[in-house]
Regions:
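Non-heme Fe(II)/2-oxoglutarate
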Residues: 2-15, 59, 63, 87, ...
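Short, surface-exposed loop/helix-turn segments at secondary-structure junctions
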Residues: 77-82, 151-152, 200-212, 263-269
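Active-site region of the double-stranded beta-helix
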Residues: 127-130, 153-160, 171-180, 186-188
């Protein structure tokens, strides 16, 4: 069987107790390549941002008015008129117009600066954490035209420091059936793997042929998060709940002393910071990286060269 579609054999285990023992937390993070935390954020914090994102969708007539607002059901007749190109633009599951409005939300970007989240990564890194400003929202509209995110390593797209970690935070309850995130446990140990082309988000699929790692997954509740190393292979699961929209955030963090690639300081999408910042009240969220002294590493396109997938 192709390892990319092999069923999961591992279940997520709550790493919250490890926060009291930093050395154990670091050992477990290195061994598994990821850590899962139950109820890391309060449900109220998640639902507040979920509401703001759903308001954007409602303004664009993308919610089903006959269903409860917070349930996040899509306006299926309108979604069905969208092209494959619109739905798969930039791998975020919705149109550029919708995404632009989400990127303008101050509270969306503020999530990466949550004191509890920065404290977690300070503990993991053993030094001050730098939160990347290039925050990503996934607004996965329900459509058969939407490509599922293939197995991949984030380092292919981020580069800079390999000790960059992603926090995947669902904006609401996201069970496996709604298209949650699956992690290939221990795959951070395998180094940078070869890739082939794939139509899903990022355009690249990591080739897993001959590797013996096992998939871990589970149902996420609002407030749960999973964090994982840039070399850890992960993938999206298909949305099998008709009509439901899946909302999640990708937030990235690294030790402040480590090098970075310049694109990590740009907006996610063809936007400009000055325009996104219009109407913001928190000056501390604007251009905060300019006070840092980074070593910049050039983007290496050669690691993205594609091979044939032969399993």
């Amino acid at each position: 069987m192709d390892p990319a579609i092999k069923p999961a054999t591992r279940a997520f285990e709550d790493a919250t107790p490890l926060l009291a023992t930093p050395e154990e937390l670091r050992r477990e993070a290195a061994r598994k390549g990821y850590l899962f935390f139950k109820h890391f954020f309060t449900r109220e914090e998640i639902m507040e941002l979920r509401t703001q994102i759903l308001n954007v969708l409602q303004d664009e007539n993308l919610l089903d008015p006959a269903k409860p607002f917070l349930d996040g059901f899509g306006n299926q007749p309108l979604i069905d008129t969208m092209t494959m190109e619109e739905l798969n633009w930039n791998g975020i599951g919705t149109t550029q117009q919708v995404y632009h409005k989400v990127q303008k939300l101050q509270d969306f970007h503020a999530f990466a600066h949550h004191p509890k989240l920065l404290g977690l990564f300070d503990t993991l890194f053993g030094e001050r954490t730098f939160p990347h400003p290039r925050n990503i929202a996934r607004i996965m509209l329900p459509s058969d035209k939407l490509n599922v995110t293939p197995p991949h390593q984030d380092f292919l797209h981020i580069q800079g420091s390999s000790n960059t970690w992603t926090c995947w935070a669902p904006m609401g309850d996201v069970p496996v059936s709604l298209g949650s995130l699956s992690i290939l446990e221990g795959s951070n140990d395998g180094g940078l793997l070869q890739v082939t082309s794939n139509p899903g988000a990022g355009g690249l699929e990591t080739i897993l042929c001959g590797l013996g790692y096992e998939w871990a997954e589970g149902d996420y509740e609002a407030g749960d998060i999973v964090i994982f190393h840039s070399m850890t292979v992960h993938k999206g699961l298909p949305n099998r709940q008709p009509g439901r929209i899946r909302l999640s955030l990708d937030l990235r963090f690294q030790p402040v002393s480590q090098p970075i690639e310049n694109a990590s300081l740009l907006p996610h999408g063809p936007f400009e910071w000055d325009e996104l910042y219009e109407g913001w009240t928190r000056e501390d969220l604007k251009y905060y990286w300019k006070k840092e002294q980074f070593e910049f590493l050039p983007f290496d396109e050669s690691i993205r060269w594609q091979k044939d997938k032969i399993c």
